[in-house]
Amino acid sequence: MQKMSEKPLYRAAENPTRNADRRAGRFEEEELISKTGRHPDMVIQFQDDADDQHTSHYEGNWRHYFHKKLHIKNRLIRDWLSESLAMFLFMSLLLGGAATAHFTGKQDDPMLTAVFHGFSAVFGIYVGAGVSGGIINPALTFAVALLGRVSWRKCLVLVSAQYFGSFIASAVVYLIYYESLQNYAKTADDNGEFLQKTAGIWSTFPKPYLSMTGAIFNQIFCTMLLSIGFLSISDHKNFRPTKGLFPFAVGLLIMTVFLAFSYSAGAAMNPARDLSPRLWSLIIGYGNEVFSHNDYKWFWIPWLFPYVGALFGAVMYQIFVGVHWPDKQSTKR
């Protein structure tokens, strides 16, 4: 009994800072909550509430002047701007990849479409991760708000930014590929072949044989898998990746789900990815068919049911994993 009691004392005396660091790390989350009022449960929030600091070498020069003039102190506005740009980059790469696939006749290649879906998400998350979180998905934003990882007020701000960034990206990609679209239209006949072939650039459409029930279940299940994976990757208690690898883990998750379940209905999994480009395609002349497709039994499915799938995923993750973590102050595993 004496040896057992002496062993930890000896180690503490040998390196007195190690145990102190461990104790400090154990209560790091509580300290962060008390200082910022935010839940530290996600990798993507690692700089969200950090105080802005001016480096000394900027003071007195034009960089410092513009930084001082343009800097916005309102946290929600900063979140909106960051998430808008993150979503803009994500959707620009995604829609640009979709356009290239259509022009080259490879729109039905699941590996190609999965790759540009996944890597587009990777770089979009990198843009917004340090400020807004870079969630770039209204359904996942709803899921993390449901679990208390972001406030509902911030949730609404991020969702509006995501829809906005997606819409602007749709417009920019259309302008960039305008001449290519016109040239591609010359090869189409007068029976709407051009619209049928290129509408898939902007939004998802189901296979002709897919029933409404099958489409609903597809959207719920795909987004549920995405939600479970995303919440596990971002859970600080789980075996999560480092901050720098977090976007790659999410991108790999998106690629995997897309490869597995995109055949029947496109696996949108993201309301802003589908609705905003669909609105843009209506504006540029694709007609009401982008909404009336399948007798109005489709357009609302990839918009509404990803929210349902994200909700199911959040509930399942909490029931099967989240609520079973040991107490924060407990050292036992």
UniProtKB/Swiss-Prot annotation:
Q: Which InterPro entries match?
A: Aquaporin-like, MIP, MIP/Aquaporin
* Top-rank taxon: Eukaryota
A GO cellular component entry from the record? plasma membrane
- Membrane topology per the record? Multi-pass membrane protein
Can you tell me where the transmembrane regions are? 85-105, 116-136, 156-176, 213-233, 245-265, 303-323
Please state, per the UniProt record, what induces or represses the expression of this protein.
Answer: Transcript abundance is medium and expression is slightly down-regulated in the inactive stage (during anhydrobiois).
Where this protein primarily resides, as one coarse class? membrane
According to the UniProt entry, where does the motif NPA 1 sit in this chain?
137-139
Q: Name one Pfam family in it.
A: MIP
- Location within or outside the cell: Cell membrane
Q: Which UniProt keywords apply?
A: Cell membrane, Membrane, Repeat, Stress response, Transmembrane, Transmembrane helix, Transport
This protein's record includes keyword Protein transport: no
The Swiss-Prot or TrEMBL record describes its family as follows: Belongs to the MIP/aquaporin (TC 1.A.8) family.
Function recorded in the entry: Aquaglyceroporin that may modulate the water content and osmolytes during anhydrobiosis.
Q: What is this protein called?
A: Aquaporin-1
Source species of the chain:
Milnesium tardigradum
In the UniProt record, the gene name given for this protein reads AQP1
